[in-house]
């Protein structure tokens, strides 16, 4: 990547060209695989060799775990266009679901694993300061030999007492025993990231292996029980379901077809 001296009033132009914002450095940058020539007015004049080296880097497609279930199932062609040509549908879930995820994580993260389910071995949930906010796999290859990376933000990561690991993803949804299978590629993708860790902007994803438990914790809205002023108590039914088996080979097949 190449960091840029992009002023605030030109950030939209930079973003439209494919520039990305690094929150830690508080600077815009040209991601690997994006031609830096269009960004030259924000690059120091003595960086000519760096620009040439950067432009030789092949673009690596990054796939989010959630896209491998939801986005492909909804519109395969849209998924292809977004990853291959950068054409986005901007069909994102409402922000309220992200807020629900944060509230749910905050409630469970300091609890014992048995608080969620007796099916889970004894262990603890890794805290926010033990994991990067966003995690990335190392460079992986599909069945056609094409490079890709998996990049995402997990909900709950478990370290069991025997130093094996688990991942739980939150879903606000109708409870079903089939939910883990419905989100199987997302769950397997998170496990694959931790077992084949890479880095984002020099921040390394830790190696957590083996991952032995993959599960969905479902929240099904039931009723409002009490109201106090402009606040109310919303009751949810909970459903916990595990993915029966790891499906790494099927994940690679899925990426290849995508």
Task: Please report, for each region that a protein language model flagged, where it lies by residue.
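An active-site-proximal "capping" alpha-helix that borders the catalytic cofactor pocket
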Residues: 184-195
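Metal-dependent nuclease catalytic regions and adjoining charged, substrate-binding loops involved
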Residues: 52-65, 197-258
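Catalytic phosphate/metal-binding cores of nucleic-acid and nucleotide-processing enzymes, i.e., regions
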Residues: 91-94, 177, 207-209
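Metal-dependent nuclease catalytic cores that hydrolyze phosphodiester bonds in DNA/RNA
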Residues: 47-162
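Conserved catalytic cores of phosphodiester-cleaving nucleases, focusing on short active-site segments
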Residues: 152-176, 190
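Short, mixed charged/polar active-site loops
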Residues: 147-151, 164-165, 229-238
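Active-site metal-coordination segments of metallo-dependent hydrolases
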Residues: 176-184
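Accessory DNA-engaging acidic/polar modules
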Residues: 1-50
